[in-house]
């Protein structure tokens, strides 16, 4: 008799995705981050659901309701900090997951990669509207500054900004709609993640060598389920260490001051995971140029398959490209640091150089280096 997991319409889908899935036998720990992102999403949806039970999306009571959650709700403080630091974990996993895709040439799976870029944009949008909800100083001014960037769009810009605000400034209408967006977007992310997996399972996973692994595959369960559980335990260990010892390490102290439209904070900056993009935005003196640079910094990922000139898929056997990849990582860390600094000398020039280098590496140096490596191998 055939096992029910192979015949039942629903269980068959789960079986083919997580149990009997043929997986390459040599995928390393860098392949753990897909499952970790799934866990992060589930964790964020669950903690967010419990927070939404006590939160009020009104400018008069939003800040107080978050304080109430932390002080009066049973275990409210841990739910709130798991949600806030869970977002940081989400982005750490996201950046590593994208970096893995760049390093090992996973972007040659076009549909999977493009859905992934859409997912990245959606998660960034969700995190942005979520940061506005506690209605602290940085929430209010962050929302004002970032939504204002849309006014750079010619002709319709100003009308568009006021339409998003629901008035002439960031106010009650803005907070209410941002809460609605923040509630619905994670479910859209979950749906997109399923499409992401669907396309991935059409081709099968990539592996560190970048060559087809059809000849040497193993069942996903028990080998990779055990490996994923180890990754999940380490993720929870890291997250709970943050939550229980230094819950405010990655937050901004200004957000513990209730929003005040009459008092601008000295340094307006987003959460740490947006600082690299914020630094690129600030490095262009022109408003429209800055907005275009900001969007391009993420949208450039869609061009990766077109910019791939190497005869090899993975970087594992390409030392020159490896060096360039790690320079890119260092450059992104530099941009993250610059994004958190005030707009003054020498930070302005460092930010501009780092921004130029970011686009230069991806658009020019990587394709040229790949071609040089092809010639060195006489291909």
From Swiss-Prot:
CC cofactor note: Binds 2 heme b groups non-covalently.
Chain positions recorded as heme b b562 binding sites: 83, 182
Single GO BP term: mitochondrial electron transport, ubiquinol to cytochrome c
Transmembrane portions of the chain: 33-53, 77-98, 113-133, 178-198, 226-246, 288-308, 320-340, 347-367
Presence of keyword Mitochondrion: yes
A Pfam family that the UniProt record links to this protein: Cytochrom_B_C
Cofactor(s) this protein cannot do without: heme b
Subcellular localization: Mitochondrion inner membrane
Binding site residues for heme b b566: 97, 196
UniProt entry keywords in alphabetical sequence: Electron transport, Heme, Iron, Membrane, Metal-binding, Mitochondrion, Mitochondrion inner membrane, Respiratory chain, Transmembrane, Transmembrane helix, Transport, Ubiquinone
Family: Belongs to the cytochrome b family.
Quaternary structure note: The cytochrome bc1 complex contains 11 subunits: 3 respiratory subunits (MT-CYB, CYC1 and UQCRFS1), 2 core proteins (UQCRC1 and UQCRC2) and 6 low-molecular weight proteins (UQCRH/QCR6, UQCRB/QCR7, UQCRQ/QCR8, UQCR10/QCR9, UQCR11/QCR10 and a cleavage product of UQCRFS1). This cytochrome bc1 complex then forms a dimer.
PANTHER family: CYTOCHROME B
Protein name: Cytochrome b
Primary gene name: MT-CYB
